[in-house]
Amino acid sequence: MIEQIYNYFTIDMLYYWVNLGVLPFWLILIFFPTSSLCRYFVTSIFPFIILSGAYIFLLYKSYLSSYDFDSNFSLYLGIDNIKELFSNKNFLMMFWIHFISINLFTGGWIVKDSQKFMMSKFLLSIPLIILYLIGPLGLLIYWLIRIFYAKNISLYD
Protein backbone atom coordinates (compact mmCIF):
# COMPACT_ATOMS: atom_id res chain seq x y z
CA MET A 1 0.00 0.00 0.00
CA ILE A 2 2.80 2.43 0.84
CA GLU A 3 4.43 1.64 -2.48
CA GLN A 4 1.16 2.39 -4.28
CA ILE A 5 0.91 5.77 -2.55
CA TYR A 6 4.54 6.48 -3.38
CA ASN A 7 4.00 5.59 -7.05
CA TYR A 8 0.73 7.54 -7.27
CA PHE A 9 2.18 10.80 -5.98
CA THR A 10 4.49 11.74 -8.78
CA ILE A 11 5.70 15.34 -8.86
CA ASP A 12 2.95 16.24 -11.34
CA MET A 13 0.25 14.57 -9.24
CA LEU A 14 1.56 16.23 -6.07
CA TYR A 15 1.42 19.59 -7.85
CA TYR A 16 -2.19 18.90 -8.82
CA TRP A 17 -3.24 17.90 -5.29
CA VAL A 18 -1.43 20.76 -3.55
CA ASN A 19 -3.09 23.31 -5.82
CA LEU A 20 -6.48 21.67 -5.49
CA GLY A 21 -6.03 21.16 -1.75
CA VAL A 22 -5.49 24.82 -0.87
CA LEU A 23 -8.54 26.04 -2.80
CA PRO A 24 -11.08 25.19 -0.06
CA PHE A 25 -8.95 27.08 2.47
CA TRP A 26 -8.81 30.13 0.21
CA LEU A 27 -12.55 29.98 -0.50
CA ILE A 28 -13.25 29.90 3.23
CA LEU A 29 -10.87 32.84 3.78
CA ILE A 30 -12.56 34.89 1.06
CA PHE A 31 -16.24 34.04 1.62
CA PHE A 32 -16.41 33.16 5.34
CA PRO A 33 -13.58 35.08 7.05
CA THR A 34 -15.38 35.50 10.38
CA SER A 35 -16.79 31.98 10.67
CA SER A 36 -15.64 29.42 13.19
CA LEU A 37 -14.85 27.16 10.23
CA CYS A 38 -12.24 29.71 9.16
CA ARG A 39 -10.89 30.08 12.68
CA TYR A 40 -10.50 26.35 13.32
CA PHE A 41 -9.41 25.12 9.90
CA VAL A 42 -7.76 27.96 7.99
CA THR A 43 -6.18 30.37 10.44
CA SER A 44 -4.97 27.52 12.66
CA ILE A 45 -2.03 25.18 12.12
CA PHE A 46 -4.19 22.61 10.28
CA PRO A 47 -3.46 23.53 6.62
CA PHE A 48 0.24 23.86 7.36
CA ILE A 49 0.40 20.37 8.83
CA ILE A 50 -1.02 19.06 5.55
CA LEU A 51 1.36 21.14 3.43
CA SER A 52 4.27 20.12 5.67
CA GLY A 53 3.33 16.49 5.08
CA ALA A 54 3.48 17.07 1.33
CA TYR A 55 6.84 18.82 1.75
CA ILE A 56 8.25 15.98 3.86
CA PHE A 57 7.00 13.43 1.32
CA LEU A 58 8.72 15.41 -1.42
CA LEU A 59 11.96 15.57 0.57
CA TYR A 60 11.75 11.81 1.09
CA LYS A 61 11.17 11.23 -2.63
CA SER A 62 14.08 13.53 -3.42
CA TYR A 63 16.34 11.73 -0.98
CA LEU A 64 15.51 8.36 -2.54
CA SER A 65 16.30 9.70 -6.00
CA SER A 66 19.74 10.94 -4.80
CA TYR A 67 18.84 14.63 -5.08
CA ASP A 68 21.78 16.93 -4.33
CA PHE A 69 20.42 19.07 -1.47
CA ASP A 70 23.66 21.04 -1.26
CA SER A 71 22.92 22.53 -4.67
CA ASN A 72 19.94 24.37 -3.16
CA PHE A 73 22.34 26.83 -1.57
CA SER A 74 23.60 27.91 -4.97
CA LEU A 75 20.38 29.87 -5.48
CA TYR A 76 22.02 32.77 -3.65
CA LEU A 77 24.87 32.97 -6.16
CA GLY A 78 22.95 34.51 -9.04
CA ILE A 79 19.91 34.46 -11.27
CA ASP A 80 21.43 31.82 -13.55
CA ASN A 81 21.77 29.47 -10.59
CA ILE A 82 18.10 29.96 -9.73
CA LYS A 83 17.17 29.22 -13.33
CA GLU A 84 19.20 26.03 -13.18
CA LEU A 85 17.62 24.98 -9.87
CA PHE A 86 14.10 25.60 -11.18
CA SER A 87 14.80 23.27 -14.08
CA ASN A 88 14.73 20.47 -11.50
CA LYS A 89 11.11 19.40 -10.84
CA ASN A 90 11.85 18.40 -7.24
CA PHE A 91 13.25 21.81 -6.34
CA LEU A 92 10.48 23.58 -8.23
CA MET A 93 7.83 21.64 -6.32
CA MET A 94 9.57 22.35 -2.99
CA PHE A 95 9.53 26.03 -3.88
CA TRP A 96 5.88 25.87 -4.92
CA ILE A 97 4.76 24.29 -1.63
CA HIS A 98 6.81 26.91 0.20
CA PHE A 99 5.13 29.70 -1.80
CA ILE A 100 1.62 28.27 -1.33
CA SER A 101 2.19 27.93 2.43
CA ILE A 102 3.44 31.48 2.86
CA ASN A 103 0.56 32.91 0.82
CA LEU A 104 -2.00 30.95 2.84
CA PHE A 105 -0.38 32.00 6.11
CA THR A 106 -0.43 35.63 4.99
CA GLY A 107 -4.08 35.31 3.99
CA GLY A 108 -4.88 33.95 7.45
CA TRP A 109 -3.00 36.81 9.06
CA ILE A 110 -4.89 39.36 6.95
CA VAL A 111 -8.22 37.85 8.05
CA LYS A 112 -7.23 37.86 11.73
CA ASP A 113 -5.85 41.39 11.53
CA SER A 114 -8.88 42.74 9.68
CA GLN A 115 -11.17 41.56 12.47
CA LYS A 116 -9.54 44.06 14.83
CA PHE A 117 -10.80 46.87 12.59
CA MET A 118 -14.22 45.40 11.68
CA MET A 119 -13.55 45.56 7.94
CA SER A 120 -16.30 44.51 5.57
CA LYS A 121 -16.04 41.04 4.07
CA PHE A 122 -16.40 42.44 0.56
CA LEU A 123 -13.56 44.91 1.00
CA LEU A 124 -11.42 42.20 2.58
CA SER A 125 -12.01 39.84 -0.34
CA ILE A 126 -10.20 42.16 -2.77
CA PRO A 127 -6.71 41.93 -1.22
CA LEU A 128 -7.25 38.23 -0.46
CA ILE A 129 -7.98 37.41 -4.10
CA ILE A 130 -5.01 39.49 -5.23
CA LEU A 131 -2.83 37.80 -2.59
CA TYR A 132 -3.88 34.38 -3.89
CA LEU A 133 -3.10 35.31 -7.49
CA ILE A 134 -0.15 37.70 -7.21
CA GLY A 135 1.20 37.37 -3.66
CA PRO A 136 2.91 40.40 -2.13
CA LEU A 137 0.77 42.89 -4.05
CA GLY A 138 -2.29 41.65 -2.15
CA LEU A 139 -0.52 42.28 1.15
CA LEU A 140 0.37 45.81 0.04
CA ILE A 141 -3.23 46.51 -0.98
CA TYR A 142 -4.47 45.18 2.37
CA TRP A 143 -1.99 47.39 4.20
CA LEU A 144 -3.19 50.46 2.26
CA ILE A 145 -6.83 49.63 3.09
CA ARG A 146 -5.86 49.00 6.69
CA ILE A 147 -4.40 52.50 7.02
CA PHE A 148 -7.86 53.98 6.48
CA TYR A 149 -9.47 51.67 9.05
CA ALA A 150 -6.74 52.01 11.66
CA LYS A 151 -6.39 55.75 11.04
CA ASN A 152 -2.65 55.53 11.55
CA ILE A 153 0.41 53.95 10.01
CA SER A 154 2.04 51.37 12.21
CA LEU A 155 4.84 49.16 11.02
CA TYR A 156 4.75 46.96 14.12
CA ASP A 157 1.21 45.52 14.20
Where are these regions (language model features)?
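Hydrophobic alpha-helical transmembrane segments of multi-pass membrane proteins
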Residues: 14, 94-101, 129
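Hydrophobic transmembrane alpha-helical segments in integral membrane proteins
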Residues: 2-23
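Membrane-interface helix-boundary motifs at transmembrane edges
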Residues: 32-45, 115-119
